[in-house]
Swiss-Prot record:
Similarity comment: family membership: Belongs to the D-alanine--D-alanine ligase family.
Annotated transmembrane regions: none
InterPro entries assigned: ATP-grasp, ATP_grasp_subdomain_1, D-Ala_lig_Van_CS, D_ala_D_ala, Dala_Dala_lig_C, Dala_Dala_lig_N, PreATP-grasp_dom_sf
Name assigned to this protein: D-alanine--D-alanine ligase
Primary location: cytoplasm
Keyword Transmembrane helix applies: no
C-alpha cells in the first residue's frame, strides 16, 4: 500500500511538529546552491533566491553560492555544514553536484547520486518505469539517421520530441506531421546529444509532488495545469499569469488517488528521496494516467507547484523549505543511492 491522500493532514501535522521542536543551530552554516550552467539557470536563480529568503526569515544562517559563477572547490572554503540544492537541469540535477557533495561529506537536499542520474535521463527513466510495470507513453530515441516515417508509424501523430536531459520544456516540439520531424529533431539535438520522441497523450496535464523516502514516502495533492492555448512551454510555466493551476483538481477522488499511486511508485522505482515531482498526462479517451518525467530538484518560484501542493496540505512556503533542509540531518555519509 502507498501513503497517498488519506495521510495528507497527518503529513502536515508531522511537519509542523518537527519544526516546532527543531534547534536551528543544529543546521549550522547553510549553502544554497543556485544559478548553475544549464539552460534553466534563470529559473534556478529565482528558486534559489526564494529559498534563501525563506531560510533567513526563519533565522537560518544561509548563504547563496552561484554554481555557475564560482568554482565548486570554493565550497570547502565556505565551510558550509549542509547544502540546499536549488539547481535545475544538467550539472545540478543529474548527480554531478551530488557526487561532489558526497566527496566533500556535505549533506544536501534532494535525491542522491544514482536517483539523480537516472531521473535526468528521460530515456533511462522510462526504461526503469517500464521494467516496473508503470505506464509511460511509447517512445523512441532519435538520431540524425532515424527513419521519420517509421517513427510516425510507431508513435502516431501528434508526437513529442525533446532533449533527453533538459527540463522546463526547453527544446520541446509537438510534431503534427512527418514533415515537421527533422526540424524538431534538429532543435532538440542542438541542446542535447540524446533526443527522445514519444507518443503525445491527449488529455489533462497533471503533476504530483512527492516527499520522503522509501516506505515513508508520500504523495502530496495532485495539481491540474491549464496553460493558455494548451501550450505549457517555458514562458507559460514560469512567467505567464494566464496559466491556471487547480488544486484540488476537480477530478474524481479515485482519479486523483490513481495519479498519486502511480507517481509514488515512479518515485520509489527511481530511488528518489526528500522530494520530487512527477509529471503525468491523463488520457482523455481511457482515463488512464501516464508518467512523463520525474523532477528531482523541483522549482521553488512564485509559479512553482510543490509549494502549491504543500500549502494545500497545510504547509506554507517557508516551513516547506525549512522542513526540506531539516531532512539533511538524517543523512548518513556515503548514501549515494
Amino acid at each position: 500500500m502507498f501513503n497517498v491522500g488519506a495521510n495528507l493532514s497527518s503529513w502536515g501535522d508531522r511537519v509542523k511538529s518537527s519544526l516546532a521542536g527543531m534547534d536551528l543551530k543544529s543546521l549550522g552554516r547553510v549553502g544554497v546552491l543556485l544559478g548553475g550552467k544549464s539552460g534553466e539557470r534563470e529559473i534556478s536563480l529565482m528558486s534559489g533566491n526564494g529559498v534563501l529568503e525563506a531560510l533567513r526569515s526563519k533565522g537560518v544562517d544561509a548563504h547563496a553560492f552561484d554554481a555557475g559563477l564560482r568554482c565548486p572547490t570554493e565550497l570547502v572554503k565556505e565551510k558550509f555544514d549542509r547544502i540546499f540544492i536549488s539547481l535545475h537541469g544538467r550539472f545540478g540535477e543529474d548527480g554531478t553536484i551530488q557526487g561532489l557533495l558526497e566527496l566533500l561529506g556535505l549533506p544536501y537536499t534532494g535525491s542522491a547520486v544514482l536517483a539523480s542520474a537516472l531521473a535526468i535521463d528521460k530515456i533511462v527513466t522510462k526504461q526503469v518505469w517500464i521494467s516496473n510495470g508503470l505506464a509511460t507513453p511509447e517512445y523512441e530515441e532519435l538520431t540524425a539517421t532515424s527513419d521519420w516515417n517509421a517513427v510516425v508509424q510507431h508513435l502516431g501523430l501528434p508526437l513529442i520530441v525533446k532533449p533527453a536531459h533538459e527540463g522546463s520544456s526547453l527544446g520541446l516540439t509537438k510534431v503534427k506531421s512527418v514533415e515537421e520531424l527533422p526540424a524538431a529533431y534538429k532543435l532538440a539535438a542542438g541542446l542535447d546529444k540524446k533526443v527522445i520522441a514519444e507518443t503525445c497523450i491527449i488529455g489533462d496535464e497533471l503533476t504530483c509532488p512527492l516527499v520522503g523516502q522509501g516506505k515513508t514516502a508520500e504523495a502530496l495533492p495532485v495539481i491540474k495545469i491549464i496553460p493558455p492555448q494548451a501550450n505549457y512551454d517555458f514562458h507559460n510555466k514560469y512567467f505567464s499569469d494566464e496559466t491556471q493551476y487547480l488544486c484540488p483538481t476537480g477530478l474524481a477522488p479515485e482519479v486523483n488517488a490513481a495519479v498519486q499511486t502511480l507517481a509514488l511508485a515512479a518515485y520509489k522505482a527511481l530511488g528518489c528521496r526528500t522530494w520530487g515531482r512527477a509529471d503525468v498526462m491523463l488520457d482523455q479517451k481511457t482515463g488512464k494516467p501516464y508518467l512523463l518525467e520525474m523532477n528531482t530538484s523541483p522549482g521553488m518560484t512564485s509559479h512553482s507547484l510543490v509549494p502549491m501542493a504543500a500549502k494545500a496540505a497545510g504547509i506554507e512556503y517557508a516551513d516547506l523549505v525549512l522542513w526540506l533542509l531539516s531532512q539533511t540531518l538524517q543523512q548518513k555519509e556515503g548514501a549515494t543511492t
